[in-house]
Structure formats: structure tokens, C-alpha cells
Amino acid sequence: MGTSDLRNAPPGTWLPARRLARWIFQPLERFLHVQAASGIVLLIATAVALAWANSPWAASYERLWHTPVRLGVGSYLVERDLHFWINDGLMTIFFFVVGLEIRREIHQGELSVLKRAVLPVAAALGGMLFPALIYLALNPSPPERSGWGVPMATDIAFAVGALALLGNRVPAALRVLLLALAIIDDIGAILVIAVFYSSSISVTGFGLVAVGIAGVLALQRFGVRSPVVYAAAGVVIWAGLLSAGVHPTITGVLLGLLTPVHPWFGEEGFLAEARRALEDFQERATGGHDARELTGPLAQLSQARREALPPVVRLEAALHPWVAYGIMPLFALANAGVSLGDVHLGAAGSTRLLLGVVFGLTMGKPLGIMVACSLSVKLGLAALPRGVLWRGVLVVGCVAGIGFTMAIFVAGLAFGAGQRLGVAKLAVLLGSLISALVAMAVGRLVLRPAEAGQIAATADEAEASTEY
């Protein structure tokens, strides 16, 4: 056994087996480091769900996601189906990662300047208003009129995955703009659901949310660093939002925005703490101490390593792979299976409903986002992020037309069950697919890979840019 093999393999390793494992898993590891890999996995999961839901085995698809799952402690039990725990439980972690990224950008990124933070707010408002107006123009009368909220929503998971397929053509600031826009859009959609599509709102639930948020702030004041304790406070917030009739995944956004952005030790503190830990380790190791006594300096070194980074950065790095390759594909598999067998476009009002949703997503979203961004910049209220040109905003507008699961959810509230719901689902599917394809085509035409590194020299240059 060579020296390099001794260094690269734990004691007791059978080297032929280790080489075989490396030969098998290295291509997978290289794939996972490709920027668009998460988007590819997401699209594969979507295709599987669609094929499964429209196959002879469609009943097994429905049966799987309606499997009851019971969680609880002692006599307090909550039983919901698997679909609920994925959409309202696991997706909270996705929203937490999104909240972390937004928090980091607000602190030291492109959103740290108020003038630039205004842009995603304006984009989200325009991206909600124009689709609703287009839909209402085509469907002015009830009962189809009640579906005006369907094309307003942007599906963050699918939109981010689709944008990832463009790889290094997408500047980091453009992705942040989409994330911020989609978060605000999603909050807007939830407010629409709460105000126009909800039967009742529980004030008690919001009281529980306030208690949870106060708990998080108190824990930070006491210097508590354990993620488990904060997760417990997050469960309280989640339960409060669920009880209040608000989508509980907003818990993730709230916790992400509350996450500290300053490290405990920092760079200099880490070096000093690590130096002390290594000196202690060397003293104990050379002094013939029992191996168990080495755990102290190693724990000290581990704490220094952990606290050298801000919690917002550390948590984002730890959770991102799980979200990108686990939660998001599972979410797609559970939600993308739209059965099209019962859709009849010949029924009264069906064609207008279909066109209202499709045009709202494919035309209303990019048009509303472009108009709102242009007005806010021209009026001096906002500025384009550094490195983002108007052509990039156009791509974001197209990607934002991927409504999918949130749009389907709103459709269920607007139309209940029956023919109109089937048409609305088909329209959401078509509109989202067209938006994704148009975004890919436009992105490959107008965004060049080199642009990822071409940053506007100044904020004024980015703001004044009219180049597409």
C-alpha cells in the first residue's frame, strides 16, 4: 500500500473496493457540481410525475401522495397526508434557504442599497397586476372571473430550477433578483389567498406566530447558537401560520430573514482560537495522554471552524445540496402530476379561461415586470443590480411566468372541483411550459456566458443602461 493510499483511505479499507467506489461516484460528483444540475434533476422529476399521473398506473400516484402520515408528541398528534408534509413541511426548508440568501444580499449584497431593493418589489407588483388584468379582460363574468388570481403566482422552485439551466449565462445578481421577486410575489399571492379565497382567518394563530418570533429574538439576545433550539421556535411559528390560515412555508422566509449575518469569531478570532486548540492538541498528543483527552481541543477547533462564518452563510451552504437535490425534486414529483383526462375545452367559458391563464403567465408576467422595472428606474426610485442589463430582466420576466403549483393551488380555491378546475390546471401547465421554453430560448439568445463576469463599472452605469 503506497503512502498516498494510506493518506486517502481510512484504516481497514480494502483498496480495490475504494477504487471501484471512486470510479462509480466521481462522475456523479462532477455532475452535481454543474451549475444547471439541480434544474435538470427538477425537470426529470417533473417529467416522471406527468407521465405517471397520465399512465395506466395513475391511481397509484394519487394513492401514494394521499398516504396518511402521523406526527406528534405524546397525546398531541397531527395526521395529514404525505402531500401536505412535502408541500407545507419540507418546502419550509426550501423557503428558509431562500430567506437566508435574501438576508445575506440585504446585508452585504446588491439588495443592501435601498434603491436596488425597490426593484424586486416593483417587479413583483407589476408581475402580479398585469396577469390579473389580462385574465379579467378575457373573463369578465362569473364564474370564470373568480380565477383572476391563478396567473398571478410564480413558482419559486421551478423558476429557480429553470434559470439554473442557463448555467453561467446568469449573473448572480440576476438570480438574486428572481429570488427576491419570487418571494415578494409569493407573499402577494398568499395575501390574495388570505383576503379573497379564505373563509376565515384565526387571530389566535397570529398570536402564536408573534410568540415564536419573540422567542427567536430572545434566543439571539441570550447568545444561543444551537440550530435545534431555533428549529423548535420555528415549529411554533409554523403551527401558528397553519392555524391562522396562512401558508406555513412562510415560516422559512421569516426565520431566514431573522438569521444573524455576523460571525461570532470572525477571521482573526478563528485564527487565534484555532492556534490555541492546535497547541493544546499538540501538547496532549506528545504527552502520552489517552486519546479520549484529545476530544477537548478538537471540539474547541470544531467550534472555531463553525463560528468563523456568519450563521446565514454556514446554514445556506449546509442546506443547499439537500434542498437542490432532495426537497425540490420530491416537491416536483408530488405536485407536477396533473391528470389531463377529464379536461373538455368545448364546455362554455373553457376556452376563455384557458387563454386567460396562458396569456396571463406567458405575456402578463414579462410585460408587467418589464414595465414596472422600467418605470421605477426612470422615475429614479430604483436601480438595476450591478451586472444586470435589461435583457436579463426580460429573461427573469419570462421565467416568472412559471406559475405551476401555487397557480394550481389558487385554481383549486377558485373553482373547487370539476370541469373548470381541470381546464385551469391544463392552462397552468401549458402557460408554465411555454414560459419555461421561451425563457430558455431568450436566455440563450441574449445572455452570453461571458456576461456572468461583466459587471457594470458603477451603480449609475447599471441604472442608466438601456442595452438589451
Swiss-Prot record:
One cellular-component annotation, GO: plasma membrane
Regions crossing the membrane: 31-51, 82-102, 118-138, 147-167, 176-196, 199-219, 226-246, 321-341, 353-373, 393-413, 422-442
InterPro entries: Na/H_antiporter_dom_sf (IPR023171), NhaA (IPR004670)
Gene Ontology BP terms: regulation of pH
Keywords per UniProt: Antiport, Cell inner membrane, Cell membrane, Ion transport, Membrane, Sodium, Sodium transport, Transmembrane, Transmembrane helix, Transport
GO molecular function, one term: sodium:proton antiporter activity
Record bears the keyword Ion transport: yes
Any Pfam family the entry gives: Na_H_antiport_1
Protein's membrane topology: Multi-pass membrane protein
Catalytic activity: Na(+)(in) + 2 H(+)(out) = Na(+)(out) + 2 H(+)(in)
Subcellular compartments: Cell inner membrane
Major location category of this protein: membrane
Protein's job: Na(+)/H(+) antiporter that extrudes sodium in exchange for external protons.
UniProt xrefs under NCBIfam families: NhaA
Family: Belongs to the NhaA Na(+)/H(+) (TC 2.A.33) antiporter family.
Name the UniProt record assigns to this protein: Na(+)/H(+) antiporter NhaA 2
